[in-house]
Every structure is written in C-alpha cells, then in structure tokens.
Design a protein with these regions (language model features):
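N-terminal core-binding DNA-recognition domain of tyrosine recombinases/integrases
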Residues: 47-65, 72-212, 232-233
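Basic, Lys/Arg- and aromatic-enriched nucleic-acid-binding interface segment
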Residues: 164-167, 224-257
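Short pre-functional
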Residues: 178-182, 241-261, 283, 385
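Conserved tyrosine-mediated DNA breakage-rejoining catalytic core shared by Y-recombinases
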Residues: 262-308, 314
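C-terminal catalytic core of Y-nucleophile DNA break-rejoin enzymes
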Residues: 287-307, 323-350, 372-374
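Short, basic (Lys/Arg/His-rich) helix/loop patches that form interaction surfaces
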Residues: 343-397, 404-405
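Catalytic-site neighborhood detector that most strongly recognizes the C-terminal catalytic loop/helix
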Residues: 399-424
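C-terminal secondary-structure termini that scaffold catalytic or DNA-interacting sites
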Residues: 425-432
Length: 432
C-alpha cells in the first residue's frame, strides 16, 4: 500500500515569518492533511509541538533545514506507519523508527530534492489555497549524480535502490529526535524520551546537541517580556489582564503549563492558594504522576499581581479558604483554558516583546534567544534568576525535582552573561 507523505513545514523564510500565535499551519493544504488523520492520533497537537521545537533552531537556515528534515520524518512516520501520537512513543517505537530511516520504502524516497510547495495555478481555488503541496516531494532523497539530475526534474520516479544512511546521518537522526523528546518532556507534553532508552546508542554516533540554545531569558529580555505583558494589559484589560496573570503566575512559582491549565483529574482554583498560621502563602498543585505538592509564594506576587487580578475579576483581594473560583477562565467566563490556548497567549507576549526590541534598535545578540522562547522558558528563567539567592534544597522543593542534583546541575552556575564578564577583563600579564 502506498502511503501519501506530504511536507508539513515551510521553507525557512516562510517558517520564521508566520504568526506563531495561530495554532494552525500557515498553509491550508497542510491543515487539511493533518485533519484527515483520526482524532486519536493528535496530529495537530504533534504538528504544533514540532513547530515550536523547530523554532528554537530557526536562526540559521541550514540548521533549521537539518532539524526540520528529521522531526518531520518522525511525525510523518508516527502518523502514517505507526499510527500513534508522536508524544506517546516508547523505546521499541524509537528503535523501529531508526531502522526505518536506514532503509525507507520506495514511496518515501525521491530522486532529487524538490520544492515542498508550489503556487496554485487553479484560478478557482487559488484564493483559498495560494500554495499547494508538491505531490512529487518525498521525505527522503536518493543521491543522484549531478549529470542525471536534469532528467529527473519532471520525473515521478521514486528511487530506493541503494539508499543507505551513513553512520553520521543516523547520528543526526538520533540526536535531533532525542532532543525533540527532551523538549516535549520540558513542556509537559511527553512523559519519557524513547530515544534515551534505545539499545546500542553508540552505533548512531550520538553527539551532544551543539545547536541548542539556553532555555532561559536574559534579565534584559525578561524586563521586555514583563513590560510588554503589562502594556498589553493596560491597552486591552478585558483581554490581557488574564495574559499578564498567567505569565507572572508561571514565572513566580516555576510552574509548568499543566499547573495552570490543569490535568484530567485536577483543575486549579483560587482556593489552591492557602495561607499558613505564620501568614506564608502556598500554592497547592497536583503535578506529574498525580503527586501533590505545595509551592512557596513570594510576597511581591501576592501584593502586586494576585490581588490585582482578583480585583479585576470583582473578587476579594485575597483568596478565601476553599474558594472554588477557577484560577483562569475563558473570556466568556467558562472554567479553564487548554494548554494550547495558554501557550498561544504567552507566545503573543514573547512575539510582541521581540517586536519592541527590534523597534528600539536593540542589538541582534540581545534578541536572538528570545526568538525561540516558549512557555517553559518562564520556569527556567525564574529558577535561574532565583538560584543565587535561594538554598538549593528549597529551590528543589519548589521546582519539584525528585533529585537535588538536577537542581544543582541546572541552576547553580553563573548565567552565561555573568560567566563571560567574570573573565572578560582579566589580563594575561602582571597577575601578581
């Protein structure tokens, strides 16, 4: 049986220019393709997760193309071959995918690299579909001698004879796909990294991910993000007081998306803020693995933002005992938001902050990492800022890390800027 495999992601320039607050592809035919899969495969959710991951590597067109190639293949394979949501893969699935990449079927291999999308020449549909999927595109390309490539441009031939992935190529597959699942775990979208458990990792020549960015904002970037959210709230309070509250709540308490959007068995309420006998505030959550925990709440958050949002909602300044008011609601007042909706709201803040930095002529190096920021960066950023001032054990408890070493290895080191400045002006002579 021939399985239709279509490109899911744009060229580099079109990819970076799209509106990432929209939870759909910028190309309608891609949306139609994703919607053609059974609902339980969560094709659109998988696509959005992959899109955000790829955004981390969009600064360099060549790096982006490399990462897009591997993640796109994995998503297409999980939907078409495995028929399983990409967020639910296990070790055996990862091993099966790696074997698949060594010798893909003929229908997945093309003789030359082709354009992913083409201008729609059909005047009756061009308004709705300005570009369409190139049906000749394939996820894999067989290396063809240069002198024969011209003859293949208009060919429909699919080539798999002699297709072999090199050890270096398989190392890229392993490294990039493993990095993708580490990202999914951070974003609370997957429970495990199936590639981390693969047997005989050394055969894939896996190397550290040198293209990864530090997933924390700089102090300057955070100032812009917070100021932008406050400006959005001032300009459109009915729409963005909630956005500001979500942003500052996640940042203040190192929260994951699920801590604020909720889980199937738990939805956060204002009553989850509780004050102890000494007047300290705690936020009670049901986290990963259905583990209950409490997180210390800083005074600045309570007096500056929690009370502000509650007054905006017409509530008493502070949460009451066993209060059932949902922590966040839709604009119409319905309880709760989906994690996808929360991500979109935060993405709008990041994008607007980046636009402000551009408008104010900030240097490129000051903005670069903000282009890749996602909701989980708030947790990392806050912990990075707070680590120099907090006991490691206390920070571990509020981050809900099971292992103290994880907290120490991740946050108890200098910020890159501080590290650079600590050596920048040290001379090489007269050090006595």
């Amino acid at each position: 049986m021939t399985i239709s495999t279509y490109p899911l992601f744009e060229s580099h320039d079109d990819f970076v220019d799209q509106d990432f607050t929209v939870c759909r592809s910028s190309i309608r035919s891609v949306n139609d393709y994703l919607e053609s899969f059974d609902e339980e495969l969560l094709a659109i959710d998988g696509y959005l997760a992959a899109r955000t991951y790829l955004r981390h590597y969009a600064e360099n067109p060549l790096t982006f193309s490399t990462y897009r190639c591997q993640v796109e293949r994995l998503l297409l394979w999980s939907l078409n071959i495995l028929k399983k949501p990409i967020t639910q893969l296990k070790r055996l699935d990862a091993e099966a995918f790696l074997e698949f990449c060594k010798n893909p079927p003929a229908s997945w291999v093309g003789p030359i690299i082709r354009n992913r999308f083409l201008d729609n020449k059909d005047s009756t549909t061009t308004l709705a579909h300005p570009v369409v999927i190139n049906s000749k595109w394939r996820p894999f390309t067989q290396k063809t001698p240069k002198q024969f490539r011209g003859d293949l441009v208009n060919s429909d031939d699919q080539v798999s004879q002699g297709y072999h992935s090199s050890k270096g190529s398989m190392g890229n597959v392993f490294k990039i796909c493993s990095g993708f699942y580490e990202y999914l775990i951070e974003e609370d979208l997957a429970g495990t990294n199936p590639f981390r458990k693969v047997n005989k990792k050394n055969q894939y020549n896996a190397t550290p991910d040198e293209g990864a960015v530090t997933r924390a904002l700089t102090p300057l970037q955070w100032d812009y993000v917070l100021e932008t959210a406050e400006a959005m709230a001032a300009a459109e309070p009915n729409k963005h007081e909630r956005t500001l509250f979500i942003l500052i709540t996640m940042f203040s308490m190192y929260l994951r998306i699920s801590d604020i959007a909720g889980r199937s068995n738990w939805k956060p309420t204002m009553g989850d803020f509780r004050r102890d006998q000494e007047g300290n505030w705690w936020f009670h959550v049901i986290g990963k693995g259905n583990k209950s925990a409490k997180i210390a709440v800083r005074d600045d958050y309570v007096t500056g933002y929690l009370t502000r949002y509650r007054r905006f909602l017409g509530l008493s300044p502070l949460p009451e005992y066993q209060e059932k008011t949902p922590l966040i609601t839709t604009l119409s007042g319905r309880s709760g938001l989906s994690d996808r909706q929360v991500r979109a709201l935060l993405q709008a803040v990041f994008d607007n902050a980046l636009n402000r930095m551009r408008t104010e002529d900030r240097e490129a190096y000051e903005m670069d990492s903000l282009r890749a920021a996602s909701s989980h960066w708030l947790r990392h950023t806050s912990a990075t800022f707070d680590a120099p001032f907090r006991n490691a054990k206390d920070l571990q408890s509020d981050l809900r890390h099971s292992n103290l070493a994880t907290t120490q290895n991740t946050y108890y080191h200098s910020h890159d800027q501080e590290r650079a400045h600590s050596v920048k002006r040290l001379g090489l002579r007269d050090r006595g």
